[in-house]
């Protein structure tokens, strides 16, 4: 109960203070079931509060690095259990909390069921964001994140278009690090695969537009400087329009200046 209460109070502003309290309680845990339940709770919170997935990723990294569990546990037990549960929820079609809740939805009407299904999709999307932030914070390796990307491309497509949405969520968050760390061949193969998927006849226009964001992201690197924060595609297009406008004015001005020379 104390751990759940502290998790509910966790904010970016209070991160250091609350996370220290959480770690102090974890250090006193003697039961593996209690530890498992707490890890489930963190993952569920991260899935539900997906806007704060970076904060929950940093919490788990801090716990894995600084907590000192009882000697009855094997070394790095928190990290091992946490990553195993993250892997399960990533690979499976639905996170554990959705699977657990779904049997209770049998008697819901159409609109209530639609709300629950939307919540289920948001939980999955939240988990993808958590995985992305674990990679950004170096808890997952380049090799693992490449496996995650290929999981959605090779194993899921075109069974469920939602998986391509989750792929886009993942890549948009990690793209800058992915571009710097992964081998150039991996990047070229990835974007070639995306291009082939977009050109296929089995996708809806909606999904093709979402995937096109990844194409634009790849092409926009010619515009974004490495030291700058990644630009939104809308801002990139605005910048392109401005640059084209400036160039047009310059050409027009040069033509007139030559006439008066």
Residue ranges of each PLM-predicted region?
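Alpha-helical interaction scaffolds
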Residues: 1-261
């Amino acid at each position: 109960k104390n751990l759940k209460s502290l998790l509910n109070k966790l904010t970016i502003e209070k991160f250091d203070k609350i996370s220290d309290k959480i770690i102090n309680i974890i250090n006193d845990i003697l039961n593996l079931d209690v530890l498992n339940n707490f890890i489930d709770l963190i993952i569920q919170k991260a899935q539900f509060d997906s806007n704060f997935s970076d904060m929950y990723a940093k919490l788990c990294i801090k716990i894995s690095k600084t907590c000192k569990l009882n000697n009855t546990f094997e070394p790095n037990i928190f990290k091992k259990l946490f990553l195993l549960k993250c892997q399960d929820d990533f690979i499976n079609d639905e996170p554990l909390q959705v699977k657990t809740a779904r049997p209770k939805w049998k008697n819901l009407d159409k609109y209530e069921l639609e709300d629950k299904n939307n919540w289920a999709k948001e939980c999955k999307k939240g988990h993808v964001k958590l995985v992305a932030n674990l990679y950004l914070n170096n808890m997952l390796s380049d090799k693992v994140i490449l496996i995650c990307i290929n999981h959605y491309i090779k194993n899921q497509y075109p069974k469920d278009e939602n998986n391509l949405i989750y792929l886009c969520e993942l890549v948009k968050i990690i793209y800058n690090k992915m571009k710097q760390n992964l081998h150039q061949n991996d990047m070229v193969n990835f974007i070639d695969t995306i291009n082939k998927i977009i050109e296929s006849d089995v996708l809806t226009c909606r999904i093709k537009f979402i995937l096109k964001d990844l194409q634009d992201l790849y092409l926009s690197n010619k515009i974004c400087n490495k030291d700058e924060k990644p630009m939104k595609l809308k801002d990139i297009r605005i910048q392109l329009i401005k640059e084209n406008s400036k160039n047009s004015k310059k050409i027009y001005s040069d033509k007139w200046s030559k006439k008066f020379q």
